[in-house]
């Protein structure tokens, strides 16, 4: 091999080694060359012994000639020999060679090695390799499935052995059966009595103290309120069998008594409370001081007997009892008196009939007062149904008569009440007719009628024609399309850096549009933004034209109008913007600077600046379709759509377009 070929191999080796090391970092690779000095990255499968070329991703034939890079000696691959890092009996790291075909271990010198005390890196004895793998093991043992890898160390080495003839339940028990968890010894079971009452650790006040000490002002208010108002502690302590010994309810609520906690709710252990109760009760009666104190208490007993000597006092009480009975007998006597009372009551009612007549006179004296007359109208409506015969004049003032008729019909028989009522009714009727002064009602109606004509807008109608001639609308209004053609051409000259450009138009609106489009020819609009200006502008695909006379890329105007690129308010969301009939051109929801709905005026849906201003068209707009947000476009991946067009197909808002372009927020995500 010449030096030229050697240099060529070294150069190829540098490239291939870097590539293979990046693609296969965990594989031991041997580099060799074939008879034509072609470089190969060689790898031997430890299970099969096959040789692969990594750069070609192919298996090489077993007799393929391969040579070392720096010499002409052939490369010999030992058949299925695996190097292993093991630890001997002294825990020293040793590298051993395992031959799968012969199922033996060799040391680095090629000598057969006894691995009875050796273990591998996973602490598995190397003897297990000899027991589970190799041709001898497969020949001695007969299993339902052949050993994987033709004697390669089994992947299940070290796992529990499962009897293949056992039932599935037994196999599962052999595989996954674990020793039962160690039970707690008896010395850990607390058999002592519950401690005495301590208010610091009282179950009733503990939660309140924890709430006061750990109160978090930033926590949700309803969570804190829930812990306070809906707490079940009071109920559980009184009625929960797991919290207290409910056989002794008073003891559970006595602050000086012992109580059972949930740990001692067992009925067998609950009996342990009884001797604790007896212990404090014994010294109390044993106290000797109690006996002499009881002797004077017996002497004071006769003193108590002297107090009940008030026996004569109840005797007069018995005498007063008949005295009380006497007025009780008098009480039934007024019952006939009550019967007599309604009879005289009818007489003052008859006297009451002349009384309302002076009241009517009082009403007549203030004739000018409007509210009193209104009350008479209300009485007129109530009294009309009662008197059937008197149709014409009973209406103004029969108020006293019907009021009297209603109680009399209920209390007294109809025979006596009818003649009394008939006699007074004609008298007030005759007096009422002159008092009512029916012409009074007519002038009131006359007053309402003149009130209506001043409300009529006749003088306002006279004012309107006066305003109309003053308006200068016809002087500057654009004439209709039919009259535009004969008008003389309006011309305007715009001076740009490229020279003078003259535009001839016949329509004022077209002139304004072309003037606005020519305003974008200056360099400030077409040049690439400087680094410090790159983030002051929205991306080119996010621009929305706002006014005819406002240049789209006027840098001073954009710098001075930061409100156009601020985060939108609640009113400027797509839900609210649909009422304006305007659809945003390209809304990028990852870029809040593009949500400038306030600048969307006087333009229809999907108006893009590139189509409206053909002279101002940067290169980025050629991929506008890809950069534009497809949230509002329902025809995104339709095969019939044109991916190069800048405007999606027209959809009428009456055909459900708005509901699909601006869906309800609940359809965006369930968490909204």
Swiss-Prot record:
Residues 310-339 are annotated as: 2 X 10 AA repeats of V-E-P-T-P-T-P-V-V-E. Residues 312-428 are annotated as: 6 X 5 AA repeats of P-X-P-X-P. Its main location: membrane. It is found in: Cell projection, Attachment organelle membrane. Residues 160-456 are annotated as: 8 X 3 AA repeats of P-V-V. Keywords: Cell membrane, Cell projection, Cytadherence, Membrane, Repeat, Virulence. Residues 177-197 are annotated as: Disordered. Sequence repeats lie at residues 98-100, 106-108, 160-162, 197-199, 206-208, 211-213, 221-223, 226-228, 235-237, 249-251, 288-290, 310-319, 312-315, 316-318, 322-324, 330-339, 332-335, 336-338, 354-358, 385-389, 396-400, 402-404, 413-415, 424-428, 454-456. Disulfide bonds: none annotated. This is Cytadherence high molecular weight protein 3. It comes from Mycoplasma pneumoniae (strain ATCC 29342 / M129 / Subtype 1) (Mycoplasmoides pneumoniae).
């Amino acid at each position: 091999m010449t030096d030229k070929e050697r240099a060529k191999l070294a150069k190829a080796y540098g490239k291939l080694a870097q590539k293979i090391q990046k693609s296969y970092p965990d594989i031991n690779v041997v580099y060799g060359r074939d008879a034509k000095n072609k470089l190969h990255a060689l790898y031997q499968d430890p299970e099969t012994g096959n040789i692969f070329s990594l750069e070609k991703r192919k298996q090489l034939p077993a007799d393929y000639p391969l040579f070392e890079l720096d010499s002409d000696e052939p490369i010999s691959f030992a058949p299925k020999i695996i190097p292993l890092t093991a630890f001997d009996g002294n825990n020293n790291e040793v590298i051993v060679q395992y031959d799968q075909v012969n199922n033996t271990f060799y040391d680095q010198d090629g000598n057969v090695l006894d691995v009875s005390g050796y273990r591998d890196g996973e602490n598995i004895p190397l003897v297990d390799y000899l027991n589970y793998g190799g041709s001898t093991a497969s020949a001695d043992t007969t299993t339902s499935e052949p050993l994987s890898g033709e004697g390669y160390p089994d992947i299940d080495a070290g796992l529990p052995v499962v009897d293949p003839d056992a039932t599935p339940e037994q196999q599962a028990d052999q595989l996954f059966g674990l020793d039962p968890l160690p039970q707690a010894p008896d010395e850990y079971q607390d058999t002592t009595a519950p401690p005495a009452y301590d208010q610091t650790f009282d179950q009733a006040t503990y939660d309140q103290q924890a709430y006061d000490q750990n109160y978090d002002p930033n926590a949700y208010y309803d969570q804190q309120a829930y812990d306070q108002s809906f707490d079940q502690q009071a109920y559980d302590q009184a009625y929960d069998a797991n919290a207290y010994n409910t056989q002794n309810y008073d003891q559970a609520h006595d602050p000086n008594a012992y109580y059972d906690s949930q740990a001692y709710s067992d009925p067998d252990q609950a009996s342990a409370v009884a001797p604790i109760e007896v212990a404090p009760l014994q010294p109390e009666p044993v106290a000797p001081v109690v006996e002499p104190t009881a002797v004077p208490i017996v002497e004071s007993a006769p003193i108590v007997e002297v107090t009940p000597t008030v026996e004569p006092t109840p005797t007069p009480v018995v005498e007063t009892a008949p005295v009380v009975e006497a007025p009780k007998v008098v009480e039934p006597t007024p019952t006939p008196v009550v019967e007599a009372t309604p009879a005289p009551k009818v007489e003052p009612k008859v006297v009451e009939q002349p009384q309302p007549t002076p009241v009517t006179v009082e009403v007549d004296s203030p004739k000018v007062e409007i509210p009193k007359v209104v009350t008479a109208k209300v009485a007129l409506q109530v009294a009309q149904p009662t008197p059937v015969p008197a149709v014409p004049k009973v209406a103004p003032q029969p108020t006293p008569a019907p009021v009297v008729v209603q109680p009399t019909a209920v209390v007294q028989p109809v025979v006596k009440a009818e003649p009394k009522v008939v006699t007074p009714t004609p008298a007030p009727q005759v007096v009422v007719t002159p008092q009512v002064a029916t012409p009074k009602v007519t002038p009131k109606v006359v007053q309402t009628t003149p009130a209506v004509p001043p409300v009529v807008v006749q003088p306002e109608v006279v004012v309107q024609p006066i305003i109309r001639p003053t308006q200068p609308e016809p002087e500057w209004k654009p004439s209709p399309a039919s009259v535009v053609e004969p008008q003389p051409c309006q011309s305007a000259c715009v001076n740009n850096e490229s020279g003078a450009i003259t535009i001839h138009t016949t329509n004022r609106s077209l002139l304004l549009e072309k003037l606005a489009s020519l305003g974008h020819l200056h360099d400030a609009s077409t040049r690439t933004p400087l680094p410090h200006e790159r983030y002051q502008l929205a991306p080119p695909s996010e621009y929305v034209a706002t006014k005819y006379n406002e240049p789209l890329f006027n840098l001073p105007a954009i710098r001075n109008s930061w409100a156009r690129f601020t985060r939108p308010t609640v009113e400027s969301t797509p839900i609210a913007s649909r009422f304006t009939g305007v659809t945003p051109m390209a809304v990028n929801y990852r870029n809040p600077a593009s949500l400038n709905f306030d600048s969307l005026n006087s333009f229809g849906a999907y108006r893009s600046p590139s189509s409206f201003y053909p002279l101002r068209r940067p290169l980025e707009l050629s991929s506008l379709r890809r950069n534009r947000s497809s949230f509002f476009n329902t025809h995104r991946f339709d095969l019939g759509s044109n991916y190069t067009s800048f405007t999606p197909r027209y959809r009428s808002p009456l055909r459900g377009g708005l509901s699909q372009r601006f869906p309800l927020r609940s359809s965006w995500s369930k968490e909204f």
